[in-house]
Amino acid sequence: MELLRVENLCKTYGSGETAVHALDNVSFSVGKGEFVAVVGSSGSGKSTLLHIIGGVDCPTSGRVFVDGTNIYTLNESKLAIFRRRQVGLIYQFYNLIPVLDVEENITLPLLLDARCPDKAQLDELLGMLGLTDRRKHLPNQLSGGQQQRVSIGRALINSPALMLADEPTGNLDSKSSADIISLLRAFNKKFHQTLILITHDHDIALQADRIIGIEDGRIMKDEVIRR
Amino acid sequence: MNVMKSFTLKSLRRNKKRTVVTIIGVIISAAMITAVAGFFTSFLNLLQRDAIESSGNWHAVIKDVNAEDFDTVIYDTAVDQAVLGKDLGYSVLRTSENKYKQYIYLRQYTKSGFDRMSVRLVSGRLPTALNEVAISESIGKSAGIKYRIGDTLDLELGRRETLDGRVIADNQSLYYEMDDNGNQTIGERIVTESTRSFIVVGVIARPTFEYSWSAGCGAVGYLDETAFSPYDAADIYLTASKLDRSIFNTIPALAEKAGKTADDVEFNTNLLRDYGVVENDNLHEFLTGFALVLIVIIIIASVSLIYNAFAISVAERSKQLGLLSSVGATRRQKRNSVFFEGFFIGVIGIPLGILAGYGGMAVTLAAIAPLLKSVINTSSDVTLTLVVTPLSIVAAVVLSALTIFISAYIPARRASRITPIDAIRQTEEVRLTRKAVKTSRLTRKVFGFEADVALKNLKRSRKKYRATVFSLVVSLVLFLTVSTYASMAGTLSGATYDGYNYDIGVTYSNNMMDRADMNDRIAALDLVESHTETANVSGTVRLEAKQVSEYTRRFQQPIQDGLYDLGMTLASVDDDTFISYAQTVGADAEEFYDIEEPRGILINHAQDYYTEDGKYLKKLSGDVLNLREGDTLAFAAADGDDASAKTTELAVGAVTYERPMGTLIQSFYASTLVVTEAVFNAVTNDFTEDQTRSIQHAIYLSTGDDQRLERQLGELTQGTEEISIHNIRSAARAERNISVFLGVFVYGFIILISVICIANIFNTVSTNIALRRKEFAMLRSVGMTPKSFNRMIRFESIFYGLKGLLYGLPISVAIAFLLHNMQQSVLSTPFTLAWHSYAFAILMILVIVFATMLYATKTIKKENIINALKEDGF
């Protein structure tokens, strides 16, 4: 069953002769529960693609359907609510709120929804993330790996249908990297969430169900490696 | 340009908004300093021009110098400009209609002397030959002699002396003697020294050497400096080449060189005082001190703004400076980059500020000059205009530059200490602890998650906010203190000049001898429109309860059952006044002259200010007594402690609320009985010596031009200690104008200081928002809607404003209370706060903070989330 469909997506920076085409007529679709790795060299447009899918950047043209809704027809408030409830975005540089502690950072999407986090669910999540004894710490009191796990927790707390991860392990050592990836895979399998992950790491890419290769803003390859 | 400088300029350009706001701050600060300095010099200049107008533009005169010694004086290094003057003396004006202006008084000047002695031509031309004169317009106006241009004057000129041969000094008023029959006759004569003929060629305004009381009307003639014989002598009016206190030594020394003595030197103290050249100099010192206090306040407010701007800039650039440091920038280079920033801002801001300051002052002075005129009594054609001197410009530049230097000093030192490691570490974030950002659970429950984040943000950057909260507090306190003071002064001034029905009062003390003569002289002044001569004595009347009004009974206790002793003023007015007063009241004046059956007109009106239960002052107005025409009362003049004083039966001839000029409305314990002079003299005839001494004499005047009349009266009565002059109209007007005048300056000052504070708030808030761009983008990326973003900003503004109010309000209230206590001695009113000012101030603080926040977040809200997230804070 299809969860995400991208149609003729273009993103251009600048105009005229200096225009840079970060995305050039990209179209593909991803099914529910699929784990897709996006690979490509620096500046190939893969991060831009991810951001546009996540609703934090705007395409120059083209459409993005998530669960049948074209997200760029939504107004700003509805788009914010879409981000809050449907998408979990994980950045390379964690982007945590410095004044909020681990628990608050993780439950941020719920708090913005004025909802109370489910205690048991939160505890389970903290346990899986290995942050149980760090729940009251501020981001600056954590290591890089821990901070990344907090940002993963934040992406997962709403059990969003779509998980987007932009080189989540780019800044981490190999041990932490492995932990993070297996964590993401576990959620992908357990909750049947769709996961799109950008990586430079060949080994990580090989763990995915499908690999999409992007060069110069175009899809150069799209192969399913396991079904 | 070296790399440090270009880096600095780039960062200024990158933070265009903050740079502009800081430059505006510098402009305002320089403008205010310029305005204060400009006002100070303009005001002194006004005083100088006024002194020149009234006494001429010269510093000293050496009298009666022989012609052969002229060059000794004129070409002395101590002398800048010199003109010759010759005093030809007095000649009788035979047909004068003014009994006090019986002479013409002639002085001659060399050509440039007319200008230097402030001779103002009214018609015709100035004399250019020895046999020509221009006469004072007072000859026509006061003495009533109409000369026409071209008429010939035959003058027997000479000195005045008394009949027994004593010399009368110039400018003394005409000397009268009393003969055996009590009639006045002129007690002086003129000793003729020369007889000459002159042609009238022009009419001039009253010259500086003619006073309104002078016995002679002025006239000026021409003196040819080339036509002196060696035996002639003349007065030399001079300006000193070096104007300071040393002239009190150099000029007398010069006089001695010219064969004269120090006694022949007179200084133009009037003018010298306004140049600050006096032996002791209070006014000058006071003005200087006042200007300095204002400038210090301006500098403090400006430093708090500009310091903040530099501190923010250094904090923002710490990563940049750290990187520069890691590739080898020295401490000196880092420090100088901040000073260069200050230099750049100053080079743009200070010149603009000085222009703005002078421009603003020119407009303000033009607007308030008419008000000021009534406050400081200057000659009619001297007005306050802006004067720009090189010295005041230099002072403004130096002070503004100093302000910037002080502001940049600490940030520059901090910049010099930035190390490479600071660039790598985000120092502030590291220090953040859980405890610092801990908030009550209640906040989130009651106000929502946004409020909680807002509060945490506030707590996080406590230090950064401190300077801005300080600015908030300073502007709040300044504003509230001034408005509290203004409203208190308002309640005070309302009551002061109520019920006065004359313009100028001249009162005599009881040892004044020739009062009648002085009354005549005063009444003869051409500016007096009407006058009332009065005498009054206070005493008591004993009355039964039914004769006393209900109001009076409320305020006065009976001395025994049903009997009241109430104050009464027995007042006489001159016959002319009495006749018209009786007419106004509807009585027949003839009935009031019978000294066997004395009667008077009862003024039965009282007015009082009254407080009840600590509430506001209330004005009460009504009858004092229940008396009717035909009733009698027993008047007892006050006589020390003697209770058994003799009483006089007086009849009430009429009862009225009308008052003759000079009589004031009484309070409820007293009334006034107006009688004729004849009756008054009869009643007071058998007074004891003490009682006679308690009689007060005065003359009250109405006029169209109280200021000129007051000056004339001052000149007329000069030196007479027994006379005091009260210009009620001018006092009331001055009081009103002073409050307007002060209002313009004080509120102008407060507004500009507030603008600096607002600029400060704007800078810190917008920088703070800019630094948190990434964080805001983060919140939006995880799904914060614009609505809840606004909610968060709103809460942050409110918390922020509240913090300012938390400190500002108690301080303001405390100051208001102190002010209230200080003015308790003047008028006792209950302590109240100017609620509307407080409400306004509170609202303004919140609005300013909120508007700034809104403005600062406007761009951020529209910004692409990803662009903000990519920002690395460099």
Predicted regions located by residue number:
Chain A
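H-loop (His-switch) and adjacent beta-strand-loop-beta switch element
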Residues: 211-223
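ABC family nucleotide-binding domain
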Residues: 2-214
